[in-house]
Swiss-Prot record:
Function: Small subunit of the glutamine-dependent carbamoyl phosphate synthetase (CPSase). CPSase catalyzes the formation of carbamoyl phosphate from the ammonia moiety of glutamine, carbonate, and phosphate donated by ATP, constituting the first step of 2 biosynthetic pathways, one leading to arginine and/or urea and the other to pyrimidine nucleotides. The small subunit (glutamine amidotransferase) binds and cleaves glutamine to supply the large subunit with the substrate ammonia.
Keywords, sorted A to Z: Amino-acid biosynthesis, Arginine biosynthesis, ATP-binding, Glutamine amidotransferase, Ligase, Nucleotide-binding, Pyrimidine biosynthesis
Top EC group: ligase
Catalytic activity: hydrogencarbonate + L-glutamine + 2 ATP + H2O = carbamoyl phosphate + L-glutamate + 2 ADP + phosphate + 2 H(+)
Residue ranges annotated for the Glutamine amidotransferase type-1 domain, each copy included: 203-389
Name of the molecule in the record: Carbamoyl phosphate synthase small chain
Gene symbol of the encoding locus: carA
Keyword Isomerase: no
Organism: Haemophilus ducreyi (strain 35000HP / ATCC 700724)
Amino acid sequence: MFNPAILVLADGSTFYGKSIGYQAVSAYSIGEVVFNTAMTGYQEILTDPSYAKQIVTLTYPHIGNTGTNDEDNESNQIYASGLIIRDLPLLHSNFRATSSLSDYLIQHNIIAIADIDTRRLTRILRETGSQAGCIYIPNENESLAQAVEKAQDLAKSFGSMAGKDLAKEVTCQHRYEWQEGIWHLPTNNAGKPFNLQTTPTFHVVAYDFGIKQNILRMLAERGCKITVVPAQTSAEDILALNPDGIFLSNGPGDPEPCTYAIQSIRQLLNTQKPIFGICLGHQLLGLAVGAKTRKMAFGHHGANHPVQDLKTEHVLITSQNHGFEIDEYSLPENVIVTHRSLFDNSVQGIELTNQVAFSFQGHPEANPGPQDVAYLFDKFINAVQATKA
């Protein structure tokens, strides 16, 4: 039995639906409401730390068809503050499924709403930009008008993502090592779905600003021993680990308040060790070389974003998840733009001309989405190999 639920945006836009997650009356969740156009991958989206403090609207109408499983998580918990969908199927079916989407949300105490007009909501967000919002489960002692007013007040209390340093909130507390490679279908019941890299060739230190596990798997699959370190790790501590290369991960929030990371990256750039950044790591690399970042109106969230590699002129379909971008006109002379969005011409990749350091705004590791940009991992490994030789 699903309880009634409402979604109210900070501007007062109101939607009525049913609660498909955590069911307690008077429960609520607040965050920045964004929309994602991916047709699949809802479990990966929910567990992506980049969605911390965000309520995710999935524009594809049928969500939950394949249930959830124990292998598709991108972290050890759900980081999205809430989920908004149009229709939740009554049945789920997939040979890997261990739970329904609703049961998965309830298990993790995540508030979610279904049966609302997600097309109307998406149009509002496109026209006004991302807004704070609140999913609220009314109680029987309050009128609907009272519930809406309360939810709007809660939404307004969230404020803006600008100025929020969320990397410190989602990062690991202690460094750890990673050896697990990419997923594959086991050939028998005793097989393991993930390869273990037992004879690594390179040592990469990865900053965890909210790192997705498939990024680590892509590096491990290419022969890397990965040491994952907390976001506030100093450059001196990084160098003490004697890495062959340095990776700057994805993550949530505004990059500008992450001054600790920007300072460390600046120092690491002086070492000539290869550096590769993704998403938030891309923005932090830009800030470290003197560029500026800015908040986007509604960001890029989806698995079908066309991006052009300016060197090869190839068009790549990419997975995207970010609400901030590098201001191209603030880039210094020693930085070139390598990739550009074909949706809005925003900067999607940069590279330093005087050392081995480059980054990409989207997600070459996908999960969910295409792997057209996975070659950037190979580029990083080739740079590590050349530097080590």
